[in-house]
From Swiss-Prot:
One GO term (biological process): innate immune response
Enzyme class: transferase
Name recorded for this polypeptide: Cyclic GMP-AMP synthase-like receptor
UniProt source species: Exaiptasia diaphana
E.C. designation(s): 2.7.7.86
Length: 546
């Protein structure tokens, strides 16, 4: 009769207890035969179900079934002997154990051991041979795991190698074959470009919104718009132009540009612009204009204190230097008025100063952040400069279209008080509103993102690239955009590389035509040989990314 039969178990219990009574205590785990058979059938079904579930799970993973380790056998044989003993006999489990998942796990382990020939004796203790077998299987399992790990690592390394090869092939396929060109590689070593891309999107929306609100509600409404209370000649229309409104702003939101259009009564009649033409003796004045005073329109002679003599045909002119100084003084007085009230929306401010054609205002806000604002005074001209009449006509552009060119010309232009070094009575022609019209449509947002990355790189090397400025970059961007296909079949890396290479070539040739005036005005004509050498050296280093 088998070792685990009911009769043998009864005899063993009677021998231990010294009893000959046919009644066996329930503590011995002996139940009536019918109940025992029912429990055996239930336990066998539970074990089979667990085994089938494990088998299906292991097959779905594509790996062989995990084998119990020596640690599992020691735990099941030493710490839970009563469970294995009663399971082997087909009797009930320890109270409170059979209803838990841990008991089911132990039963399944026992079934697996039995299926592999690892018989557990009636005393539920593993023999030395069984432990050796378990240890050997545990070692094999660890070896298999290491094998799987090594195989996965090989697959991952192979995948990375394929990615590197594909990237290298893509770079070779898209690289320029021009002799002497410098290639901006699309790799992790290109730290310059990756930093620029990161900085490009670093503008905090909360920060820029707070500062834009300060500019709109304080600077525009409380300062600039209230200047007329001090001098009623100075009434303004605010023109939202500049990098922020063109969505070309990069870096910190600590600088804003505001254009204010002088809008006095009959101003366009009182001052008539006289644009300089491209003549041999006055080529240096292309892009500038005189504002000639028409005295018969100024009945009260209100503007005589801002005039100077010595213009063409000996007519009085509106002086850019005098009006800029007067405008700065008006802003200073208005700041003092607000500061005296004691409810100023800033912690401190600096006295207004001249910064090119602008008056610079500097504020320290309540959060200790500094904000610089350049207020540019301008006067509108109803006429398009004759020197720019050929824009978009002689050489039709891919962009913008003919209709957009015509609409821009009808709106005229502006003049700002930036003097010419050779003639300080001139006003510089400004095409800011025309540039805003060209750069505002969302259809060119993708190209603008490329330009912003280049602009970030420029800001990082600004000192080494002097006297280049952001306006030179914008002009080149407009020219490249007008070609229509500068981004065609190029990745972002290649577009930026192409932009910098074009800038390098323009500097080397000392030639960058004004976008609207064309070759009549070369923005790089005043570059010295030393400046060209410094700029080209810096640009080569940027492209090489050393």
């Amino acid at each position: 009769m088998p070792v685990g039969s009911r009769q043998n178990r009864v005899q063993a219990v009677r021998k231990v207890s010294g009893s000959t009574d046919s009644t066996i205590p329930r503590e011995a785990g002996i139940y009536p035969i019918r109940y025992t058979e029912r429990k055996e059938r239930k336990d066998v079904q539970t074990v089979e179900n667990g085994t089938n579930e494990d088998s299906r799970a292991s097959q779905s993973r594509g790996r062989r079934r995990r084998q119990p380790t020596s640690r599992t056998l020691r735990q099941t044989s030493q710490s839970r002997p009563e469970v294995l003993e009663r399971n082997e006999s087909g009797s009930d489990c320890k109270k409170g154990v059979h209803s838990h998942s841990s008991a089911r796990k132990v039963e399944r382990e026992g079934s697996r051991c039995a299926s592999r020939g690892l018989h557990l004796s009636s005393t539920t203790r593993c023999t030395a041979x069984e432990l050796d077998v378990a240890k050997q299987e545990e070692k094999e399992e660890e070896d298999n795991k290491e094998g799987y790990a090594d195989e996965e690592q090989k697959i991952e390394n192979s995948t990375q190698e394929r990615k590197v090869v594909n990237t290298s092939m893509e770079d070779k396929a898209t690289s320029h074959s021009t002799k002497g060109s410098f290639r901006l590689t699309n790799s992790d070593s290109n730290k310059e470009l990756h930093k620029a891309i990161k900085v490009r999107g670093s503008l905090s929306k909360t920060d820029i919104t707070e500062k834009a609100k300060f500019v709109n509600e304080v600077v525009e409404k409380e300062i600039i718009s209230q200047v007329f209370k001090i001098d009623n000649r100075f009434t303004f229309d605010i023109l939202h132009a500049g990098s922020y409104y063109e969505r070309l702003k990069v870096g910190e939101a600590d600088e804003f540009d505001i254009m204010v259009q002088l809008n006095a009564a009959k101003l366009s009649n009182i001052f008539q612009p006289r644009f300089c033409v491209a003549r041999r003796h006055s080529r240096h004045l292309v892009g500038f204009a005189y504002l000639e005073y028409q005295s018969h329109f100024d009945g009260h002679k209100k503007w005589e204190d801002l005039l100077e003599t010595g213009g063409p045909d000996s007519r009085p002119l509106l002086s850019p230097k005098l009006i800029l100084e007067h405008f700065k003084e008006l802003l200073s007085q208005r700041l003092h008025q607000i500061n005296c009230v004691g409810k100023q929306p800033w912690r401190s401010y600096c006295e207004p100063s001249l910064h090119g054609p602008a008056v610079k205002l500097t504020f320290c806000l309540a959060n200790d952040k500094t904000l610089d604002i350049d207020v540019v005074l301008c006067i509108q001209s109803q006429h398009w400069p004759p020197v720019a009449n050929n824009w978009g006509v002689l050489n039709p552009l891919q962009w913008p279209g003919a209709q957009q060119v015509e609409n821009i010309k009808k709106r005229g232009c502006h003049v700002v008080p930036k003097v010419n070094p050779r003639d300080q009575k001139c006003w510089r022609t400004s095409f800011s509103l025309a540039e805003k019209d060209l750069l505002s449509p969302k259809s060119i947002d993708e190209d603008k993102e490329h330009y912003k990355i280049v602009k970030v790189i420029f800001e990082r090397h600004k000192a080494s690239l002097e006297p280049l400025c952001s306006y030179h970059l914008k002009t080149l961007f407009l020219w490249l955009r007008s070609d229509g296909n500068w981004t065609e079949k190029r990745t972002q890396f290649k577009v930026i590389e192409y932009f910098i290479q074009q800038l390098l070539e323009k500097v080397r040739m000392k030639e960058l035509p004004h976008f609207f005036i064309g070759h009549n005005l070369n923005l790089f004509s005043d570059l010295s040989d030393a400046q060209v050498t410094n700029i080209t050296t810096c640009l080569k280093e940027i492209i090489k990314n050393k």
